[in-house]
Amino acid sequence: SKDSVYQAIKKLENTYVIYTLKHDEKKLQKIYFKDFGLRNNLCISKDFSHLFENLVLSELFKFKEEFFYNKYFNFYSQISKIAYISSPTLDIDLIKLRAKKILPKALELGIFHVIFITLSSEDSFFEQGVKFEVISFDKFSLGF
């Protein structure tokens, strides 16, 4: 039943196996594994972009902030006003196009720093006062 699923999810969250991330407007939640390797072993589908997103969130735990998500940002903090987008394979030109599309939402939420985390690309640019930073995961995980 639905209730038993919710109880099981809550139990896994309380035992630090999973982490639930709330949507900023709707009553939706995404589930991430604290140990992303466990997630990879349990899932039949080995989608690298989802695994990379889980890896990025694992690194964000060190900030000890509450993060939210929406259709524009994988993670953002309402306190620090920083948004993070997991983009392992997008090139700089596609990231700049995506930045223009998400700019109105960033301004609406008061976010003035958007960080794209990639496998290896790096760049930095401004649009209407919002800093868009493209950094490699290794630099991100070391505290850029």
Region spans (language model):
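Short, conserved loop/helix-junction motifs that constitute active-site signature segments
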Residues: 106-110
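Domain-level recognition of nuclease-like catalytic cores that cleave nucleotide substrates
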Residues: 121-144
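Accessory nucleic acid-recognition modules appended to NTPase machines
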Residues: 1-81
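Conserved catalytic cores of phosphodiester-cleaving nucleases, focusing on short active-site segments
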Residues: 56, 60, 73-102, 114
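Short, glycine/serine-rich, charged loops/turns that create anion-binding
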Residues: 38, 67, 89-91, 121
